[in-house]
Swiss-Prot record:
Involved in pre-mRNA splicing and cell cycle control. This is Pre-mRNA-splicing factor RSE1. The gene is RSE1. It is found in: Nucleus. Associated with the spliceosome. Its main location: nucleus.
């Protein structure tokens, strides 16, 4: 198979994975501030919890291009900084340090110990670090354990030893922690199962007697080797360990968590056991046992032995576990355990990790859905919850005991302060432009159970509106100004109308003032605070300089008026209607002095711009002049060459706005002077203005909308930004992490004018006008450029479909092992409710009641927008499925036999068992749309032998994938009518696509099959299939011969039908040839060719061909299970493909992945990469040090700016 391709695609992530598989706490900056490092897919993200605002702020994110399996933090003795250990699929142990000054991770050590990839005998699955930072243990699922000693050398640098082996054949490791032993030799505890006897037993009896063992491995620092110090048999269901504080803080040892039991174990202590309480409630199964799935230990300040555990079950219930110790005569704990205590604490969503911060917050990395940030209200010590003691229960779990129960309740000890968006698991995705804006929106269904959501994703920045006030007239412009240079806040809002000017004072309230010195009878063109204590008002007939209550007026020459103006704190430039430029500069005494000569331009001046005066300088060196002859000229303002032309740039349309400003620049690493240009055609340009020569270079452009662009310099998060106003409002800024320039739309009203606004109540806001409204608003987050709006759903969504004409979506939802509403109601109404009271708990907090083998499923009608007045966005109708049916597939089908009327068709399965796959029967439900699609009317359902797993409209009929069968149905009065069928798939059809009379069938385990439908003979004939077995999850047709798809192992691929086979299948009368053609290797006679292949490290669940930006080319958009949204952008020219291929090769060697994985091997995890260039790697170029950028640019024979422009352009022209 050739690894080169004649098709090239550029793979980009537009939304990184949002699941968090591992989260750890540490002081990674070297200060006392705690931070959280989270692993999301291949990304490491550093978060800073802000206790004052109750928020979690992402500081930086780094793609390691590898599978992060585990994380651990450690701190060397005497140090104040935590280091991070990464266990990944690279077969290497990686130690990294966070450098706060550069806001990046730096790799300190990379030690190879085994093969790459996730393998059962290669360490990396488990990682534990000694609490005193002296050693770490990295283990595999089977057999291997390696211990590394961590130390310092004479230069106080971190060193790592050669690995010490602690292998044991025939053992499986279930859990691993480091014991807290103070400064004794480091000890690691492991839960292990010995399977060597089971392996040798042909009858299988030994499997019944397998024991789970708790082993202690001690690292002898003196002898430099590892020994197995102690072991003990524990409960056979044990699966998780938690470290118990030791030394002066506690008794040391571990908590061993098994099915419905938590046991304290240590080598020199007795065992103590408490059961995990079960839920009480009418809908709860009183015999169901729980397991601990996550937890955290927290030490309290101030007293020895003060610590507690918060342990969570699979229901989300948190239990507080504490250890009582024997006290000496003075009442101090001795370190000998007296008993174990457990009590119900609160219920929160099920988590992968819990982190308790010293500031009194709890970070919950949710298993599914949004991550949560809680504040502790209290520690649950004085509530009325029942507490259970180990003294009341036997140590041996096999001995009988009375189960204990509790009533779940709303949270009392924890208060939710922030929810962090996460789309894990993302089940389906559609693109549509329902809001009729320039760019379409992405609609997704994600989440699990009652925390599932329907989300609208929109490219833009969220805006926080502070004030929206209606004005007596329609203003054309607005400014704010201080009275003195050293004032902290703005004093006036100045509004310009067509016939006058209104001045408002800013204070506790905003009021009109008249004694300001401003001329109110004319419209205003510019307002500026000048010098130390002056104000300037530019109006069509002149300039007013107001200082200490004295007004100096400069009047424009007779029969001429001012048409454009530019100001800064020391300079004023105006353009007259005659095409002349008049320039003023402030004297040493604070008055404005006019330059003797006027500069005459060739056309009418449309816009002017002066940059800010650089610190330590007297003036801005350049004036930008835009004329109606479609040019921009740069004029010098230096005393020896005042108003001399330095450079000129031709434009495609007349400039409507100019703005010179200094902004952060990724190319130079510092700040650069830019000229921003807005054109009448709606195009925005950004060009570099050389501070020495005045030349204009490196022009980049973006189409913002059909209206002329206005530009304003604003400040957001202490960064200089450009506000660009067209048919939408846009903000241009340097990305906080990459420093690359980004132009992002604002999720706000269309504005006509904008300006900075600084007051006591709003320290960094903006003021704008649209129509008769004055609006004051602020932008809080610059990093997140995708806005999410959520609508809650009932159960886990499975598929999403859109109404063919209306702004309505339909979802099918199903949850396994969950009681359906009718069963819940029966249990609640039963007079003999055996398990407590009949309180109904909100399912989004407590989940739905469990029922083994039961399904809860429904069809929801979702209105994502509402009408803005009476109807709110939300679920407008829900149809619950009964009979233990679960919805699996859905399609909107237009039946030709019903005059093209569209129906919603839903495939269901009855009494399904997921693994091994079992069912009793399947059905196809048909619903008619009514009330403009807002209601569904049940027509009939058709019984089929297997649950339909894929449905599709096809030539005015329905095509269904039912097991291996492909079947065509038409709509009858009482049921669907079977028209044609064929067995086309080896195992199970999971996806269908069609063009013309060709159907593309995706098999669950055997890739794609191309099927031709012959209407003359009403036959379905497979004529081409795949070369390798792909476990298909989703597919879409790229063109008539090519199909893009994805599989369960995280691969994206494009397959193409051979040209000859494609033509043969379409020829009239070819069915005889196709049916009797010779099979090849138990498949069809033709094989599909692989055109492109790449590994994504997520499971793509949906893929579609779409357009994401105005005027952009079509891309392949895919959504992954972990919340990833990515695009594959086709290259238009071979030259671009070759350039990015070369760039990718250089970055592989110059910026190798942080965790040591080979990038090419990573992207070719299962099949070698073919025809796909990694855009996420190419975008790391902007974050490289300057010397590396220059070196790569030299190798590619290009400038740094040129490379960065190409990287930026390919993203902005096709995605966001």
């Amino acid at each position: 198979m050739a690894t080169t391709s004649n098709m090239f695609l550029y793979s980009l992530s537009i939304q990184p994975p949002s699941t968090i598989t591992r989260a750890i706490l540490g002081q990674f900056s070297g200060t006392k501030e705690q931070q959280i490092v989270a692993a999301s897919g291949s990304r490491l993200t550093l978060y800073r919890p802000d206790p004052t605002q109750g928020k979690v702020v992402p500081l930086m994110s780094h793609d390691v291009f590898g599978i992060i399996r585990d994380l651990a933090s450690f701190r060397l003795a005497g140090s104040s900084k935590d280091y991070l250990i990464i266990a990944s699929d690279s077969g290497r142990i990686t130690i990294v340090e966070y450098l706060p000054a550069q806001n990046r991770f730096s790799r300190i050590h990379l030690e190879t110990f085994g093969k790459s990839g996730v393998r059962r005998v290669v360490p990396g699955q488990y990682l534990a670090a000694d609490p005193k930072g002296r050693a770490c243990l990295i283990a595999s699922v089977e057999r291997c354990k390696l211990v590394y000693v961590l130390n310092r050398n004479s230069q106080a640098e971190l060193t790592i030893s050669s690995p010490l082996e602690a292998h044991k054949n025939g053992t499986l490791t279930l859990s691993l922690v480091a014991l807290d032993v103070g400064y004794s030799n480091p000890v690691f505890a492991a839960l292990e199962v010995d399977y060597s006897e089971v392996d040798q037993d042909p009858k299988g009896d030994a499997a019944q007697n397998v024991e789970t063992v708790l082993n202690y491995y001690e690292l002898d620092l003196g002898l430099n080797h590892v020994v197995r110090k102690w072991f003990d048999v524990v409960d056979s269901t044990a699966s998780m360990l938690f470290q118990v504080p030791g030394g002066s803080d506690g008794p040391s040892g571990v908590l061993v968590c098994g099915e419905e039991n938590i046991t304290y174990r240590h080598s020199n202590q007795d065992a103590f056991r408490v059961p995990i309480p079960r839920r009480k409630g009418a809908t709860e199964d009183p015999s169901r046992k729980r397991n601990i799935v996550s937890g955290v230990m927290h030490k309290l300040k101030g007293s020895a032995g003060a610590f507690f555990f918060l342990l969570q079950t699979e229901d989300g219930d948190l239990f507080k576990v504490t250890i009582d110790m024997v006290e000496d005569a003075e009442g101090n704990p001795t370190g000998e355990v007296r008993r174990l205590k457990i009590k119900y604490f609160d219920t929160i969503p099920v988590s992968n990790n819990l982190c308790i911060l010293k500031s009194g917050f709890l970070f919950v990395a949710s298993e599914f859905g949004n991550h949560l940030f809680y504040q502790f209200e209290k520690l649950g010590d004085d509530d009325e919850e029942l507490e259970f003691f180990s003294s009341d229960f036997p140590v041996d779990p096999k001995e009988p005991y009375e189960p204990v129960y509790f009533y779940p309740r709303p949270t009392e000890n924890l208060a939710l302060v922030e929810s962090i968006d996460s789309m894990n698991p993302l089940m389906d995705l559609k693109v549509a432009n329902l809001t009729e804006e320039d760019a379409p929106q992405i609609y997704t269904v994600s989440g699990k159970g009652a925390r599932s959501t329907f989300r609208m994703l929109k490219h833009g920045l969220e805006v926080n509106e502070i004030v929206a006030s209606q004005l007596p007239g329609t203003p054309s412009a607005v400014w704010t100004t201080k009275l003195r240079r050293d004032d902290e806040y703005d004093a006036y809002i100045v509004l310009s109308f067509t016939n006058g000017t209104l001045v408002l004072s800013i204070g506790e309230t905003v009021e009109e003032v008249s004694d300001t010195g401003f001329l109110s009878s004319v419209p205003t063109l510019a307002v500026q605070q000048l010098g130390d204590d002056g104000l300037v008002q530019v109006h069509p007939k002149g300039i007013r300089h107001i200082r200490n209550g004295v007004v100096n007026e400069w009047s424009s020459p007779q029969h001429r008026s001012i048409v454009a103006a530019a100001t800064n704190e020391r300079q004023v430039a105006v353009a007259l209607s005659s095409g002349e430029i008049v320039y003023f500069e402030m004297d040493t005494d604070g008055s404005l002095a006019e330059y003797d000569e006027k500069k005459e331009m060739f056309g009418t001046v449309t816009s002017l711009s002066l940059g800010e005066v650089p610190e330590g300088r007297l003036r801005s060196s350049y004036l930008a002049v835009g004329c109606d002859d479609c040019t921009v000229r740069i004029l010098s303002l230096d005393p020896e060459s005042t108003l001399e032309s330095k450079s000129v740039q031709a434009l495609t349309a007349a400039p409507s706005a100019l703005s010179i400003m200094s902004m952060e620049d990724s190319s130079s690493g510092g700040t650069t002077l830019y000229l921003h240009i807005g054109l009448n055609s709606g195009v925005y340009l950004r060009t570099v203005l050389d501070e020495v020569t005045g030349e204009l270079t490196d022009t980049r452009q973006k189409f913002l909308g059909p209206k002329a662009v206005r530009l304003f310099q604003v400040s957001v998060q202490k960064r200089t930004c450009v506000l660009a106003l067209s048919s939408r409002s846009w903000l241009g800024f340097s990305d906080p992490v990459t420093k690359g320039f980004t132009m992002t739309p604002l999720n706000y009203e269309e504005l006509e004018w904008g300006w900075n606004f600084v007051s006591e109540q709003c320290e960094e806001g903006m003021v704008g006008v649209n129509g008769q409204f004055l609006r004051i608003f602020a932008i809080e987050k610059l990093g997140d450029n995708v806005i999410q709006k959520s609508i809650p759903l009932t159960y886990t969504p499975r598929k999403l479909a859109k109404h063919p004409t209306q702004r309505i979506f339909y979802t099918i939802e199903a949850d396994n092992n969950t009681l359906a509403p009718e069963l819940r109601e029966q249990l609640m109404a039963a007079p003999t409710a055996v398990n407590g009271d009949a309180r109904v708990l909100p399912p989004d907090e407590f989940g739905y009641p469990r029922g083994n083998g039961r399904w809860a499923s429904c069809i929801s009608v979702v209105d994502p927008l509402g009408d803005g007045e009476e109807l709110e966005p939300g679920v407008v109708q829900r149809i619950d499925l009964d009979n233990n049916e679960a919805a699996l597939s859905m399609a909107v089908v237009s039946f030709a036999s019903q005059d093209g009327e569209s129906f919603l068709v839903v495939g269901t399965g009855k009494d399904m068992v997921v693994n091994p796959r079992r069912f009793t029967e399947g059905y196809i439900h048909v619903y008619r749309f009514s009330e403009d699609g807002r209601e569904l009317e049940f027509i009939h359902k058709t019984k089929v032998e297997e649950p339909p797993t894929a449905l599709l409209p096809f030539q005015g009929r329905l095509v269904a994938g039912i097991g291996r069968m492909l079947r065509i149905y038409d709509l009858g009065l009482r049921q669907l009518l079977r028209k044609a069928q064929a067995e086309v798939a080896p195992q199970l059809i999971v996806s269908l696509n069609t063009q013309g009379s060709r159907i593309i069938v995706g098999d669950v385990q055997h890739g794609l099959i191309y099927v031709a439908y012959k209407s003359e003979t009403n036959r379905l004939i497979p004529f081409a299939d795949d070369t390798i077995a792909r476990w298909t999850t989703c597919t879409t047709m790229v063109d008539y011969d090519s199909t893009a798809g994805a599989d369960k192992f995280g691969n994206l691929w494009i397959l193409r039908c051979p040209e000859k086979a494609s033509q043969e299948s379409d020829e009239p009368g070819s069915e005889v040839h196709l049916v009797h053609s010779r099979d090849y290797l138990h498949g069809t006679s033709n094989r599909l060719a692989l055109m492109a292949h790449v590994y994504t490290q997520d499971i793509p669940t949906s893929i579609c061909k779409t357009n994401l930006v105005v005027g952009g080319q079509e891309v392949l958009l895919w959504g992954g299970f972990q919340g990833t949204i990515g695009v594959l952008i086709p290259f238009v020219s071979r030259e671009d493909a070759d350039f990015f291929q070369s760039l990718e090769q250089h970055l592989r060697s110059e910026d190798p992945p942080l965790a040591g994985r080979d990038h090419l091997m990573y992207r070719g995890c299962y099949v070698p990469v073919k025809g796909v260039i990694d855009g996420d790697l190419c975008e790391r170029y902007t974050m490289l040090p300057n010397d590396k950028k220059q070196m790569i640019a030299g190798e590619l024979d290009r400038s740094v700016r040129e490379i960065e422009r190409k990287i930026s352009d390919i993203r902005t022209r096709s995605a966001f």
